[in-house]
Amino acid sequence: IRDSDYIMALVTTTEMFKKAYEGGYAIGAFNVNNMEIVQGITEACAENKAPVILQVSAGARKYANHTYLVKLVEAAMIEHPEIPMALHLDHGDTFELCKDCVDGGFSSVMIDGSHHDYEDNVALTKKVVEYAHAHGAVVEGELGRLAGIEDDVNVSAEDASYTNPAQVQDFVERTAVDSLAIAIG
């Protein structure tokens, strides 16, 4: 996507968040896993002249593979070049997956190291940030885990933990993440 001259380039979530903050509006982030969902979301965004974050979850990766989903987003960008779009990996759990998505054209990845202890989460997140930033992508980290099931990730009540506010500044400074998902209930 980045090298194509016939479609608008993906934007990063950092660019979107800055404009939204300055403009006082929210940005929709939607998990996508097939052509019809991508079409419906981008057509609605075009009608409303709204930027959009298209996310690829673990379930979508199992169903369609992120490589196929990149091509669907490329098609949406050809159809609607006027819409700022970010392609975001949602809850990536390994460096290798994040690297594959960055290499495949994603403008943003989330590394969810919340299943690790704090120091391992910091190390993993920092490694992803270093790679992604070197390749023009941005990174969302995660601190804390909510109980429940999202896609195939089942977090028991015993393993759940809210984000410790005392760790936030240290985590952001040590990892250089661009955004942070927190668990507050």
Outline where the language-model segments fall.
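N-terminal amphipathic alpha-helix/helix-capping segment at the start of soluble metabolic enzymes
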Residues: 8-28
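Alpha/beta enzyme core
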Residues: 13-19, 34-60, 67-82, 92-185
